Structure formats: structure tokens, C-alpha cells
Amino acid sequence: MVQTTKKLSILATFLFCALVFVACGDSGSSSVPDEFTDPIITPEEPPLDTITEPDTTTSDSVETYPTSFDSAGLHTYILENGVSSGNLYIFYPADSFLTKFEIGDIVTVAIVGYDTLEMPVVEKTSDVPIAHFLFSAVAGSNFVSLSIHNDSFSDVIGITAQNAPIEVNISLKEKGGFLFGLEMRYVQYLDVYPERYPELSVEEYANFREIRTTGMGEKKLYRSSSPIDDCLGRNLYVDSLAKEAGVATFINLTDTEDYARTYKDFDSSYYATQNVIYLSLPVEFYSRTFKDGIVKGFRFMIEHEGPYLVHCIYGMDRTGFTLAILEALMGAKTEEIQADYAKTFSNYFNVVDGQQVTLNEQQVDFFKAVVTRNLRAVYRADGIDIADADDIDWATPTEQFLEKQGMTKEEISALKDRLK
């Protein structure tokens, strides 16, 4: 039995001795890692996730349409060959753009006839959290671009090449407004060894916890890192904690069933004896695949008894977003949703010189803002606008969101009954 009140420095020798340091990869058919950028186990530079080069073989030229760069910003057009690989490309030299704007600025991008969005100016997709919009400007490039980290900007906005030319106006929203966000890339070092986390309990190290936000019943819903994937060195802890909590139904957001069964010790795990649905979802919150997948998972919860546990690999992005939806559905307040989401990052990051350094308040606040920003953005993409305020009702728009994904009012009510 895992004793959950003691520090890991005491427990490591008898619970963790068989676990080995293994670099994590994704599993199942999902090809995108579960990440903010890829959480880094060794202190190396984050990978350079460059924007795909656009197809410039067509004859359209930006000179065909009026382009100006004045005190108000850049006024230009997206052409037919600027809609490519899910991104929107503006054929305006990045070096010229960077004479007025700088990396780390936040800009307002008005895509005339479609939407007006705020996003940071960065170089690569991994400079921003999962599902965030970004304006990429890489010195030396003959273009700048609009993208979403791990999703298709053009699909989310509803733009195809046939819609071109499309007028775009870019203006400054906040000078240096995302500089702290860029610094946050360098707190993402984690470790598989429990002795690196002397201040964490077993539950915290395993990223295992019960969800007790407003409206959620006692011992109804849990979240964690993977109970079966040994790449983070936490699976045996999670499996033991899940057994202790009496978890009866697992929602596996990451694996296929066939892949899950290849994990070491899977057959002898508590996990293997319980109800499990294997969803193998990409980290693409706007995508039809992801939305259909979580609905499938929610229906599985309706059909099976709890307690329930939702997990991916880290229990971070896919799990964090899915749990935010369930918390919002049950009536959680903004601060509760944010605090639960940010807790995961406090449990993993920030290992420096072999020991975790507790995240400061500003760093925690950064992660808190990520989850509600993602909820608003994904809901908005489905036509559900939510005020940018803290004291809002999340339950009603969440029910609307689930209905748009095909759930009936009766199913939503049944899901809520399971979680009360």
C-alpha cells in the first residue's frame, strides 16, 4: 500500500527501485507529443519547431494588391498560395516586419471578413502553449505567418485558398507583452527520479489527484499521469494510487488498446482489470478527431460505473483540457479550473541542477491563464463566445459546446449525474 502522506525521498527505495530512466515518446497512433513544448528531461535547448515553408509555385504576387507598413501597422493581403499546410502566409519580408514589431510583442490581427485575434510575435510554434495562436516572424524569411500550435489555423478560422485574396491588418496590442511567456520555455525541465522532488508527496509526484471543484462529487473523478506507460517513471505509483482509490473506469486519451498492452507489466497491473476506453487522441483541441474522441470518452463514462480516472502520458495537455471541460460542466469557478490545471505544472517543472525549484507565483499564473484561454478559444471556434472575465458561468456554454459535438441534453444530464 502506498503511504500518501510521506515524502518521496523516504519512499523511493521500495517503490521506485525497478523503474529505469527512459526517454518518453508518444504511444499508440497519435503522432503528436503530449506537451506544452516537448517537456524536456535533460537540460538541452528546446527543439526548433519551424513553420513549414509555403508553396510559392503559383503566379500570384503580393505586389498585385496594395501593401503598406505605416505607424498603424501592416496592411496587406493573404493570397491563394498563402493558404498552405494549415497556416496563413503573408509574403512580406520578416526583416521588414521586425523593424516595427519585435519578438515577444502581442499584436492584433484583423482578418477582414473572418475574425480579429490577439497573438504573440514569435519564431516557432513551440514558443507558445498548445492550442495558442501565434504570429511567426523568422529573420531572413521572405514571409511571416499565422499559425496555431498543434492545429490548423486555416481550418479553425474557416479559410481556404479559394477565399483569397483576404485583407489582413496587423497592429501592436502590447509591446513586449509575451516576453515572460518566452522565458517560460526554460522552466520545462522534468525528471523521472523521485529524489529530484523532495518536497512532493507521492500523489504530487505521480500527478495523481481527486477533482473536488464546485459541483463535483466526492471520490467521483481523478486525474493522473499514465498508469501504464513507464517512460516518466510514475506509472507504478499511479496504478497503486488508482487501486487504493477504487477507480473502476479509466479514460485513456493517448493509447490504442493494442499499444497499451505492449507496456511492461501491463498484464499484472490493476489497470488491466478495470474498464478502460482507449481513445488515442492527437493534441489538437480544435480538431474534429479530438472533439469526437472526448465525447466518446464521456459516453463511456455514462455507460460505466465510477470512480473515473482520466489520463494521457503526462496528465497535462489532453488531460488538462478534458478535465477543464468536465469541471466547467459541473459548475466550477474560473479560479478552480485554473488552479487544478496549473497544479500539474507545479508537480513536474522546474528541475534545476538535479532538484526541483518551486514555481513562483508569476510562473503559476502563466499556466493558470493557459487553460481558460484555451477553453474560450475552442468554444469560440464553435460559435460560443465567453466573456473575458473571472466571475462567469462556465456550465451553460460548456453544455452548448457538448451539444455542438453531438451530445444530447439527456446524455449531458446523465454525465452530470455520474459526477455529482
What is each model feature region?
Residues 314, 318-319:
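Ser/Thr-glycine-rich phosphate-binding loops at phosphate-binding pockets of nucleotides
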Residues 20-23:
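C-terminal motif of bacterial Sec signal peptides marking the signal peptidase cleavage site
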Residues 26, 30-33, 40-56, 150, ...:
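Cys-dependent protein tyrosine phosphatase-like superfamily
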Residues 309, 313:
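Active-site cradle of extracellular carbohydrate-active enzymes
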Residues 58-150, 154-156, 161-169:
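Long, compositionally biased stretches
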Residues 2-12:
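Bacterial N-terminal signal peptides that target proteins for export
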